């Protein structure tokens, strides 16, 4: 039986977040995503489910940076929504909303 592996895609805003970062940090985050998320069979293993108005989303911790993603099990996709420093990710948590696709 063939094992199912997840694919990773970035939203436009996540791509912009990555471009805003220092090149060495962006490289580190891309490497982490490549090694830990691309091709994984269980994306929830390394992440943590978010709660409140971010319920349904997952976060991955890479040093002081956070990757916020939506896991779409039906199509085996990890959609990265935001990449930012921990302080920025949770600063306006009550006001922050993500459009579910």
Region spans (language model):
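Enriched for short, Lys/Arg-rich terminal
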Residues: 1, 5, 16, 27, ...
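N-terminal first-folded block
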Residues: 9-42
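Residues that form or immediately flank small-molecule/cofactor binding pockets and catalytic motifs
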Residues: 13, 55, 85
